[in-house]
Amino acid sequence: MLFRSFLIASDFGISLSDPLKVEMGLKDLYAGAKELSLETRVLNMSPAKQFSRKDGSPFYLRTMTVYDKNSTASVKLWDDKANLPGIENLKPGDLIKIIKAYVKSDLNGFPTINIGSGSNIEVTDNKSEIPTIDKITKDISELQEGQKDLVILGNIDGVVNSMEYTNSRGLPGKALRMRLKGKDGQPIRVILWGKDGSTIPNMISQDAKVRLIGVNIKNGNQGLEIHGNDSTIIEIEGDKEAKPIIARIISIATAGNGTSLILGVDKKKILYNISDYSNSTSICKEGDVIECMPSKVYGNSVTLDNDSFVRKLENDESIPSLAKIRTKINEVKVDGNYCIESIVLKIPERREIQTKSGESVLLSEMFVEDDTGQIWVKGWRNQARLLEKCELGEIISITGLNAKAGLEGRIELFLTSFSKITKKN
């Protein structure tokens, strides 16, 4: 491309002492290109961030991802260009003209478009063959490892929650986790780094439709995973305000920080994981029917805080008790949430497992059966200690179990932080 430009310039007697204005597609980008002008659509965009130079002077940087018919590329907007008037109003799919940009390689060797003092961005209403966001949206059943800068569509499958962590540089971070399923019904884990609950509605139904704009596909410990960052745009069906929930308390566990972890069920036999950070349920006991106004409801994950309220109601026979929601072992299916009653066939075994990151974690497992079948019950970390109290021949009731596919296609049950084990004999 560059060699051809030199030939054309020579034919027309143009001096090459000045940079040559170049127009090209994103797939043809190369480090060193200058005076680059091209037409693309916006995929997503990060907030502007402030950094310091070596001399201590501040500068701003904003990152944008753009796409055309064939490829995607990262765009860096420096200093004043990071806060161009109206840039916050750019939306996914908007057609823009990038003017007089230059290209450098990023840390991974990929060409990155840079917009500095001599460059600009303009919104255009030209007719374009570049597809719209809707046209490039994929169902998550179509995903493959290694794909990047995707727009994907799926439905909430289970819990949506946020987490805090410490990154490799020792700095605190946050992430939003969820699980989505596509047209084939298969769930895929989603991790959105740099996101938290403030970026999504307070009320999200258990089967809500979700579109994520700007994600990458990686292979994790349990298959494909969808990864995003603070530039990823989240579109979720939901309401700003949570709605009241009426449920029967099935079991109450306590987290290490004292938070009450309550498993509840409503009249449709939908199980809820209720995290009480405000001690609002201190007056309640297992078996009670309660009405709560949560601060957030993400799928079946319910949060109670100081802005929530809880009240006890008269018993409602239409809301099932624990005995009526227990599942027989032969009816357990992968990714479901269950409560079971069984007899211990094999005492729990405890061992240390080393993860890919080198961390050693505790795993306990025991073998149980009911009158329909047998299954392994396992617990990691703190949940492993719950199993250690079980003994051979005991009849036990376990709540808050999650079913996963194990070795050789067999299904295994895993304790969660909402699990409780009660001995029946």
Question: How should each PLM-predicted stretch be described?
Answer:
Residues 1-425:
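Single-stranded nucleic acid-binding proteins centered on OB/S1-type folds
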